Structure formats: structure tokens, C-alpha cells
Amino acid sequence: MPHTSALLGFALVSLGLVLTPGPNMIYLISRSITQGGAAGIVSLGGVALGFVFYMLCAAFGITALLLAIPFAYDALRFAGAGYLLWLAWQAVKPGGRSPFQVRKLAVDSPRKLFVMGFITNLLNPKIAMLYLALLPQFIDPTAGSVLTQSVVLGAIQIAISVSVNAMIALAAGSIALFLANRPSWMLVQRWLMGTVLAGLAVRMAVEAKRV
């Protein structure tokens, strides 16, 4: 099992990432605004299945990588820091958009909603990068099975992502209406997320390998 500090640290990173606008959030909000909160939740089920798929693939891959390549930890650490900096730039760059500035989508059946949610997540390269580059930062080979730690941390990320996205999907209509007349709030949201992610990136880059 991961150490308590690793669990809390990864939970904090996961929370910061799920609050950062991305393809999944934009799709879920668009779907909720178009068809209602229930449709957003069904779509979220497909997104969650995509998380499980990536978690299992990454868990086995991370296990093999950390055991086979001595410098894998540092390589993944810097890749993870770079990924967070890229997300921070996406949040604050000129012309950036809030996820609540969304397009209308066609009305679809529950089955199609689920499948589209799954495909949206599966085709999102940022999710693969999240598991490949960020998960290893919180794994300590001396704390037990690397595979077990990977699965536990992945499950935490999925639980946080599903919980937060469910609340966002259910409240999407009200939030979008609130922000539509308050553009300054959208700007504050983008800069807040960008600052948090940049801070996490710097911390990750300078953090020494656990022994």
C-alpha cells in the first residue's frame, strides 16, 4: 500500500487536474446543458470506464518500466512536470476558453451517451500521459508491490474525478448561466487553475527521488 503522504499528495494532484478544463469536462458539460444532468451522468459512466482501462494499462506498464529501467523515475518525473506546465499554459494562454463556453450537441440515446463518453476519454492522450507521468511520482518500491500501489492510486484518481465531474454535470446549466453574464469569473477560474498547476509542476521537478 502507498504511504499516507503519497495517498494525500496524489489525491490533491488528482483534484487539481479534474478541476482543470479538458476534453472530458467540456464534453460532459456540453451534454448536460443540452440534454440535462441525467444525460451528463450517463456520459460520465463511459468516461469512468475509460479511466479504468487506462489505469490497468498504465499500472502494468509502470510496474515493468520501474523495475527494468534505473533512470525511469527521473524521466517520468520531468515528463510529469512538463505535462502540468502544458496544462497551466492551456488554462491561461490568450484566447483560452472556459469549459462552460460550450457548443450545443445533438440529443442521443443513453447507450450512445455512454459509448461517446468512453470514446472521448479513450481518445484523450492527456489521460494516458496522466497515468504514465504522474502516477510514478507517488509510488515507493520499498512500500510493497508497485502494481498494487498503482491500482490503489489509480482508484483514488477515478473516485475523485467521477465525484467532481458528477457534481459539475448536475450543476452545469446553473453554472453556465451564472458565468455567461460574468466573464471576469471565467478569467479568474482559468488563472487560478493555471497557477495551481504551475506550482505543482515546479514542486514535482525539484522533488528528489524517494528512498
Question: Where in this protein do the model-derived segments appear?
Answer:
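Juxtamembrane transmembrane-helix termini in multi-pass membrane transport proteins
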Residues: 2-73, 133-158, 169-172, 176
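Primarily residues marking transmembrane-helix entry/exit sites
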Residues: 3, 7, 109-114, 127, ...
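Juxtamembrane helix-boundary/capping and inter-helix hinge elements in multi-pass membrane proteins
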Residues: 32-39, 108-109, 181-184
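Hydrophobic alpha-helical transmembrane segments in multi-pass integral membrane proteins
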Residues: 55-59, 123-129, 197-210
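Selective transmembrane alpha-helices of multi-pass membrane proteins
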Residues: 67-97, 164-168, 172, 176-211
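Flexible cytoplasmic inter-helical loops of multi-pass small-molecule transporters
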Residues: 93-110
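A short amphipathic helical element positioned immediately N-terminal to and/or at the very start
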Residues: 114-122
